[in-house]
């Protein structure tokens, strides 16, 4: 294990179903390998069912906490995985929306991949930002006042916080590297 991100606290949030497996597992495992402490919080502190490509059942994960029980101020970055069902459920969760607003207001980075930016739309934090996502979210993001680009990873600064976005599981290496780079700058 590397000490590159030693002392850094990462919060990954999900619903309890429909999470794209690699979009939670890869950031969790790779950020831990770099020394970060990673906490997974779900809407409920019950099993989280993951899938591959939204359709193929995969692992069942046990979250570390329920969303309502985490203090967003205790973390250095918020990570939002995709999965169509996961993102759709998260964006309708009042606690998830409030958590996003709290993290942004505190000036901490938020990283979202694939369908994860749907939650950012509902939390009203994407206006005047440039970001990427799964292509089917493009219209929703544009309607929310964001600029959308088709790139593996996009970093966007504004309103005192940084937003990092990626399109899909193929972009995970770039996504994780961008998160690690942002955290390295903040902790150096």
Report residues per predicted region:
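Catalytic nucleophile serine of serine hydrolases
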Residues: 114
């Amino acid at each position: 294990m590397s000490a590159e991100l030693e002392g850094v606290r990462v919060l990954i949030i999900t619903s309890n179903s429909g999470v794209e497996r690699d979009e939670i597992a890869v950031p969790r495992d790779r950020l831990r390998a770099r020394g970060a402490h990673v906490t997974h919080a779900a809407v409920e502190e019950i099993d989280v069912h993951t899938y591959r490509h939204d359709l193929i059942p995969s692992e069942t994960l046990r979250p570390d906490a329920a969303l309502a029980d985490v203090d967003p101020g205790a973390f250095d970055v918020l990570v939002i995985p995709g999965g169509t069902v996961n993102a759709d459920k998260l964006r309708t969760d009042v606690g998830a929306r409030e958590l996003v607003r709290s993290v942004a207001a505190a000036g901490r980075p938020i990283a979202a991949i694939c369908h994860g930016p749907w939650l950012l739309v509902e939390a009203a934090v994407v206006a005047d930002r440039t970001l990427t996502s799964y292509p089917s979210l493009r219209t929703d993001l544009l309607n929310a006042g964001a600029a959308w680009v088709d790139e593996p990873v996009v970093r966007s600064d504004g309103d005192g916080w940084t937003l990092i976005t990626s399109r899909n599981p193929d972009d995970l290496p770039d996504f994780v590297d961008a998160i690690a780079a942002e955290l390295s700058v903040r902790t150096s």
